[in-house]
Amino acid sequence: MVTIRADEISKIIRERIEQYNTEIKIVNTGTVLQVGDGIARIYGLDEVMAGELVEFEEGTIGIALNLESKNVGVVLMGDGLMIQEGSSVKATGRIAQIPVSEGYLGRVINALAKPIDGRGEISSSESRLIESPAPGIISRRSVYEPLQTGLIAIDSMIPIGRGQRELIIGDRQTGKTAVATDTILNQQGQNVICVYVAVGQKASSVAQVVNTLQERGAMEYTIVVAETADSPATLQYLAPYTGAALAEFFMYRERHTLIIYDDLSKQAQAYRQMSLLLRRPPGREAYPGDVFYLHSRLLERAAKLSSQLGEGSMTALPIVETQSGDVSAYIPTNVISITDGQIFLSADLFNAGIRPAINVGISVSRVGSAAQIKAMKQVAGKLKLELAQFAELEAFAQFASDLDKATQNQLARGQRLRELLKQSQSAPLTVEEQVITIYTGTNGYLDSLEIRQVRKFLVELRAYLKTNKPQFNEIISSTKTFTGEAEALLKEAIQEQMELFLLQEQVEKN
């Protein structure tokens, strides 16, 4: 017969009791009351934070935006077709954040930083909050380095500096995206990381931009964040913040970044849709009262950091679409007041064949010549004034029948200056080439040519200087100044090229 030893049993029981540990896990849960149109109303979730992520039973993630006395309004990051009334929801205790790393360069991702280009996962060991506070006053320094766009009209008269916010505004089909993509192409070799955020665009338009960047080798230093027109409003609203978080990751690592939001009108519309469905009170044009804050907290994240923080920068080029040139609508006026200047693209100029269709008269940069190299300041100083006087004269000349010689000369000069500002798409020019072009125009060397010959002559002159006078480019790039020696070289080249050009034209005529 087996004897039961009490001491052994009590020892085992004692050990088991010591090993037992109570682990209580408290989960903040709620119940779905109503779901539809990308919005869910949740009962419960008493301790949820504003902007906290919540998880539904079937895996959909949402953001708690409306914290009301009886329920919580949640916007869904997906279609939410499988969510049922009465199903449970749990609060995650996290605010929206995305993984960040160098691995994102050259990739196309969505607003949740998931790759959508079919090239596999992106590895990252770090994450950033989608909504981070903007750098404070002490963390910044004033903008002083140029960010060259490669477009003469912008770099000479509406200069953009690293850390600036410059709005690109105009009607649909006036070349807003073209200005932005040309700026990305021009950053090749400039050690600038570019982030292109497409909000509510056609998938075909985004694909076209990505193809252009790939063909020109610009995807190496670019990240594309895309939420197309068929994406849920929540993701269209989040996409710009995702792009900003990625750009900030590089900015705080002492790098220079350029971010393009294409476009903020679509983001505002997505936010309006969400707000109205959440039954927030509508304001002007049915936008909610905090639509200004929507854009200001995004654009304030662009900055030029102080030397203590490593002098990184984030330059923002937001795009806003106007309806038949109405700049006084709600969203355009909001974004104009937040940014440091605007580039206004006009449909009339575009249709008249002036491309890029920049209306120089009402475009401004509030950073101004602080964001230009000395050589550009030296040659471009009188360009804006001459063009403004020409526009005034041209309007007056339509009514005058006989004009004196001086007025005729001024009109002829203005037409040639307007001609030299024209550029083909995806053909950005270096600063040296821009200096050559502007100097030739403002000093009257083009006055003897017919208007149709201007562009051809300038292309040949730039090529001639590159091959026959390489020291000109060296002087400008090393000293950043248009020295007397550089001017002498340029004058020489213009005379030599002009003789060649006129001979060539003569031969072609005969």
From Swiss-Prot:
Keywords: ATP synthesis, ATP-binding, CF(1), Chloroplast, Hydrogen ion transport, Ion transport, Membrane, Nucleotide-binding, Plastid, Thylakoid, Translocase, Transport. The record marks S363 as: Required for activity. It holds the Pfam family ATP-synt_ab. ATP binds at G170, D171, R172, Q173, T174, G175, K176, T177. Signal peptide: none annotated. It comes from Lotus japonicus (Lotus corniculatus var. japonicus). NCBIfam families: atpA, PRK13343.1. It comes from the Eukaryota. It is a peripheral membrane protein. GO terms for molecular function: ADP binding; ATP binding; proton-transporting ATP synthase activity, rotational mechanism. The lineage of its organism: Eukaryota, Viridiplantae, Streptophyta, Embryophyta, Tracheophyta. InterPro entries: ATP_synth_asu-like_sf (IPR023366), ATP_synth_asu_C (IPR000793), ATP_synth_asu_C_sf (IPR038376), ATP_synth_F1_a_nt-bd_dom (IPR033732), ATP_synth_F1_asu (IPR005294), ATPase_a/bsu_AS (IPR020003), ATPase_F1/V1/A1_a/bsu_N (IPR004100), ATPase_F1/V1/A1_a/bsu_N_sf (IPR036121). This is ATP synthase subunit alpha, chloroplastic.
